[in-house]
Amino acid sequence: DICLMMRSLYSAVSGLKTNQTAMDVIGNNVANVNTIGFKSSRVVFQDVYSQTLSAATAPTETSGGINPQQVGLGVTISAIGLNMTEGSMQPSSNTLDFAITGEGFFVIRGSDGAYYYTRNGAFTLDADGYLVTANGDYVMGVMGNADDVKNGMPLYDVDGNPIFDRIKIIGSIPTGETDIDGNPIYETYTDYAVDSNGAVTAINSIGEVLTIGRLVLATFNNTGGLEKAGNSYYSVTSNSGEAEIHFVNDGCGAIKSGYLE
């Protein structure tokens, strides 16, 4: 019967196609085994609807019940899910390498002006002293001195917009004060450090160690709903929920300098 043959061929082809997709996902997982901050994916299969050849019948006084007769019509993929569990930490020799112990993501501003989120904490400094990714994208935080920057301070303005900015670690940095003409006063800092709370400290021109800013982390209601955007970045989707911005160690995890996930 041609129809029966087509049905069997369709089921076989659907199995080949879905298993090829599964192999593609597994191959990508293996290829990225040494990619910093990479999160693996898994494929979940489900059967396609079945063709009912005969329906079930109830038992009667003269005969027993009969189960339905159904022929499956193949397989399809129900989900390709992200595994967002925390990865192992590997020590590095770079003090600007950071690993997150917890569920947070670093907040990155791309060259297109959009915000992205990553677990890849392999950072460096650019010529202006800003903390950047290997791609030159800015790592975001809140700039300010020890009195200005503290846990619990609002990270959003009255309209709900984030107030974080690029993190500048060395060089000439605004102090937050102004001179008599209203111009911002700058201070030159050197010898930076970043602690487990994301606090950035540096030494000013007279040798004082001051807190000049804080890194921030983002969390999401549904991390599985994030969309991979390349460069180990993730972007927000309608099913991830909006990013909730926190100071490091404020319910979203701490960071370890000199380690990578």
Please place each PLM-identified region on the residue numbering:
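Amphipathic alpha-helical polymerization modules
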Residues: 2-163, 174-261
